[in-house]
A protein has these predicted regions:
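Active-site catalytic pocket residues across diverse enzymes, especially alpha/beta-hydrolases
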Residues: 20, 98-99, 141, 173, ...
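Flexible, low-complexity linker/boundary loops enriched in proline and small hydrophobic residues
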Residues: 5-7, 202-204, 220-227, 232-253, ...
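FabD-like malonyl-/acyl-CoA
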Residues: 1-136, 181, 185, 263-282, ...
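Flexible, low-complexity inter-domain linkers and amphipathic docking helices that mediate domain-domain
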Residues: 283-419
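Alpha/beta catalytic cores of group-transfer enzymes, especially the acyltransferase/condensing modules
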Residues: 9-11, 33-37, 70, 95-244
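Phosphate/ATP-binding catalytic cores across multiple sugar-kinase/actin-like superfamilies
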Residues: 64-75, 242-259
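Conserved small-residue
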Residues: 6-8, 31, 65, 88, ...
Length: 419
C-alpha cells in the first residue's frame, strides 16, 4: 500500500514551487484571492524575508503542497493513506476531500495568525538519543517549562519552551552521551505545547463554522497517531487540539507500517519526512525471534498438513488434546517434524510436549535439533519474475505494477487502452 505525506512549517525556502506555479495558474489565482497578496512572489522572491514569519510561511507551504498534490493527481497512482506533519495535516485533509482548496487556505491563514500572536518561545530539535533520555535530562535540570512537542523519530525530538530555557539546556544536551545535534527549528513560537492553548481555543471557534466533508482516503491525525474518524466534529476537535498538543509522527508512521503501507512518497519542497520515515522504519525492523519463528513453523509446516487450517489460529499454549489427536496422529506429526527439521524426531517428543510453545521450547534446548532448525529455515523467496512480453509497453506497465509505481486497477486500465 501507498501513503503520500506532506511537510509542515520549517520546510519553507525561497524559490519553493518554482516548477509548478506555471503549471497550475488557476490554483495560484485562487490563492491570491484568498490571501490578498501574490503568493508566487512570496514563494519565489521571499520579499523582506517574510517566509520566516509564521503568518506568511504557513499559507505558502499549504499552497505549494497543494501544487505538488495537483501534480501527483496527474502523474502518480492514488494513495491508500495520507498524512501530514503538523501544518501538513491540512494538505492531507485537502487531498482526502475534507474541504476545498479555498476553505483549507482560509483555515491555515487564520491558524497562522493565531499561532503567530503567541510570543516568547521557540523550538529546538534534539537528535541522537531516546525519548527516555530526553525526558530524564529535562527533569534532572529542572527544565519544567520545556516539553517534547514533536515525536519525529525514535531518536529525534523537537522541544518547545521559552528562549531562555532552551538556551540554558542547549549546552546540557550537547554534553549528553549520544546527542548528535541540538539545533533551533525555523518557527516563531513554542508550537504544540501548552503555551499555545489560548490560540487553540480561539481556533476552535473558527473551525466550528467550517463544513468538513467525509474523507475519501484515510488521514492520520498528528494528535492520536491514528486515522481520523468519520465524525466531522471529531476532525474539528483534533485540528484545534493539534496546535497545543505534541505531534506524534512516529506513532502515525508505525501505524501505517503495521497497516501494510510499504511505499511513502513525500509531496512538497522537502525530503525531511522521507528521512524521518526511513529512521522510523529502520528502528521498527523486528529483531529475530527464533522461538516465535519456530512456533509459527510448527503450526504451518507440521500441524496444518495434518489437521488443516485450524492449526494456524490454534493457541500456542493450548494442549494438542483440544484438537482430539490420537496416537496415530502423534506418530505422523513426529515423522513430519523429522522431515521438516531434517533429523529423526520420536513420537514421544510430541506426546510429552503437547503444545506448540512447549514443543518449540524443547526443540530449542537440543543442540542437534537447534542446528537442524537453523539449516532447515526456509530462505526468503525471491520475487516472482515477470513474464516478458513482446510489447514493451505492456512489460513496462507490469513492472510498474510490480514495484508499486502503478496500482493494479490503473495497470489493467492502461493495458486495456493499448488493445
Amino acid at each position: 500500500m501507498r501513503c503520500y505525506v506532506f511537510p509542515g512549517q520549517g520546510t519553507q525556502k525561497k524559490g519553493m514551487g518554482r516548477s509548478l506555479f506555471g503549471r497550475f495558474p488557476d490554483l495560484r489565482r485562487r490563492a491570491d484571492r484568498v490571501l490578498g497578496y501574490p503568493i508566487e512572489e512570496l514563494c519565489l522572491e521571499n520579499p523582506q524575508r517574510r517566509l520566516s514569519e509564521t503568518v506568511y510561511a504557513q499559507p505558502a507551504i499549504y499552497v505549494v503542497n497543494a501544487l505538488h498534490w495537483s501534480a501527483a493527481q496527474e502523474d502518480l497512482p492514488p494513495a491508500d493513506f495520507l498524512a501530514g506533519h503538523s501544518l501538513g495535516e491540512y494538505s492531507a485533509l485537502l487531498a482526502a476531500g475534507a474541504f476545498d482548496f479555498e476553505t483549507g487556505l482560509t483555515l491555515v491563514r487564520r491558524r497562522a495568525e493565531l499561532m503567530g500572536q503567541v510570543s516568547g518561545g521557540a523550538m529546538a530539535a534534539v537528535v541522537g538519543v531516546s525519548e527516555q533520555i530526553v525526558e530524564e535530562t529535562l527533569k534532572q535540570h529542572d527544565a519544567t517549562g520545556v516539553v517534547i512537542a514533536n515525536y519525529n523519530a525514535p531518536e529525534q525530538f523537537v522541544l518547545s519552551g521559552s528562549h531562555e530555557e532552551l538556551a540554558r539546556i542547549k549546552p546540557v544536551f550537547e554534553k549528553v552521551e549520544g546527542v548528535r545535534a541540538f539545533v533551533p527549528v525555523r518557527v516563531s513560537g513554542p508550537f504544540h505545547a501548552s503555551a499555545m492553548a489560548p490560540a487553540a481555543e480561539r481556533f476552535r471557534s473558527v473551525l466550528a463554522s467550517v463544513d468538513v466533508g467525509g474523507l475519501r482516503t484515510p488521514v492520520i491525525s498528528n494528535v492520536t497517531g491514528r486515522p481520523f474518524g468519520p465524525d466531522a466534529q471529531e476532525v474539528r476537535a483534533l485540528l484545534a487540539e493539534q496546535i497545543a498538543r505534541p505531534v506524534r509522527w512516529t506513532d502515525g508512521i508505525r501505524y501505517l507500517r503495521d497497516a501494510g503501507v510499504s511505499v511513502f512518497t513525500e509531496l512538497g519542497e522537502s525530503k525531511v519526512l522521507t528521512s524521518l520515515i526511513d529512521r522510523i522504519t529502520t528502528a521498527q525492523e523486528p529483531t529475530p525471534d527464533p522461538r516465535r519463528d519456530l512456533i509459527e513453523r510448527i503450526k504451518r509446516e507440521i500441524l496444518q498438513p495434518e489437521i488443516g487450517d485450524e492449526a494456524l489460529g490454534f493457541d500456542e499454549d493450548a494442549s494438542f488434546r483440544r484438537l482430539g489427536l490420537n496416537s496415530i496422529i502423534y506418530v505422523r506429526l513426529a515423522r513430519r517434524a523429522g522431515t521438516v527439521l531434517g533429523i529423526p524426531v520420536k513420537p514421544d517428543v510430541i506426546f510429552q510436549h503437547r503444545s506448540c510453545a512447549a514443543l518449540a521450547d524443547y526443540l530449542l534446548t537440543r543442540d542437534d535439533i537447534a542446528q537442524a532448525i537453523a539449516r532447515a529455515a526456509p530462505p526468503e523467496a525471491p520475487p516472482a519474475p515477470l513474464r516478458e512480453y513482446q510489447d514493451e509497453r505492456v512489460t513496462a506497465l507490469l513492472h510498474g505494477c510490480a514495484n508499486g509505481t502503478l496500482s493494479v486497477d490503473r495497470t489493467i486500465e492502461a493495458i486495456r487502452a493499448l488493445a
